[in-house]
């Protein structure tokens, strides 16, 4: 993957995570306010989409296969040893959350969102770190 593209996408994920943390630090319970909850879900959705895009680009660039679905992308990276089994599974579940957020928003309850925020917000950073361990950025000068 082109280094500038990767860094731009990484920066976008970091902005989404910062925005989520900003909403969580408002002092009140952001999950009890629909406007704050919407901001959190929207930024989670954005971070998910960007992570999927990074995965697809990495697979294409390194000729690892041809994913048929977003979940396939994380499975291919797991099979290639880029992601641990555990992280690959969590990222595939993230795709499921993204699908629910996009297509069945009403079922994203404050309780479910709270669990995602508590247990899985760092999955994005773990994903980026795993990619950077496998393919250090910036690439060596040839």
Predicted features, each with a name:
Residues 1-142:
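Solvent-exposed interaction patches of small proteins and small membrane subunits
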